[in-house]
């Protein structure tokens, strides 16, 4: 039954996925045995701060991977970050204003019963405190001092030639060069 809701990118070991989901849903006190909870909290904090709603914190929890780490636990892997900074707003009331994105609740979707990962994680006061601490760290080490902006500019310069030559882009080259400091697209 999992094959309708999940895509397996490696071996077809549905039993391990089923065990993980059973623990998440029915034995949450044991979740740290099957999930790298700290890495999950970092991912959720990063997605909230960058308003990347095309992942587990949205009401449509998809577009992220889980892989088995060296400790035998599932660990999240970000994917589809091109939807960050509010470019994917499904699940938010319409119309979505810039202020809505800037003031997104730090516990966005924490009570949405259809999103088990988020509701389960945020049901723990300890995990909530860790999550807020991770948000604070990201804010202090990347946003408050503009490290993220400098890094974005460096990455933009690194891929500039390839982006200009790419015939399959979603946006024009002019939009590519201006999108660090302005909204691009709808």
Regions found by a protein language model. Name each.
Residues 5-11, 67-186:
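C-terminal catalytic region of ATP-dependent kinase domains
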Residues 1-50:
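Internal "kinase-insert"/substrate-recognition segments embedded within catalytic cores
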Residues 30-32, 36-37, 47, 55-56, ...:
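Mixed-charge, polar/low-complexity N-terminal
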Residues 21-28, 48, 52-53, 135, ...:
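Sec/Tat-exported extracytoplasmic proteins
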Residues 33-87:
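Active-site acidic catalytic loop and adjacent metal/ATP-binding pocket
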């Amino acid at each position: 039954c999992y094959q309708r809701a999940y895509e397996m990118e490696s071996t077809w070991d549905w039993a391990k996925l089923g065990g993980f989901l059973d623990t998440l849903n029915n034995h949450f006190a044991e979740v740290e045995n099957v999930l790298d909870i700290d890495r999950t909290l970092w991912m959720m904090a990063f997605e909230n701060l960058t308003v990347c709603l095309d992942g587990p914190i949205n009401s449509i929890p998809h577009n992220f991977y889980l892989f088995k780490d060296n400790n035998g636990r599932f660990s999240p892997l970000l994917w589809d970050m091109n939807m960050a900074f509010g470019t994917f707003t499904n699940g938010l009331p319409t119309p979505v204003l810039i202020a809505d994105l800037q003031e997104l609740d730090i516990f966005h979707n924490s009570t949405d019963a259809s999103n088990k990962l988020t509701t389960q994680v945020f049901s723990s006061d300890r995990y909530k405190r860790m999550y807020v601490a991770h948000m604070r760290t990201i804010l202090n080490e990347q946003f408050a001092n503009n490290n993220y902006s400098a890094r974005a500019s460096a990455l933009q310069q690194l891929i500039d030639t390839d982006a200009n030559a790419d015939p399959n882009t979603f946006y024009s080259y002019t939009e590519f060069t201006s999108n660090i400091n302005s909204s691009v697209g709808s």
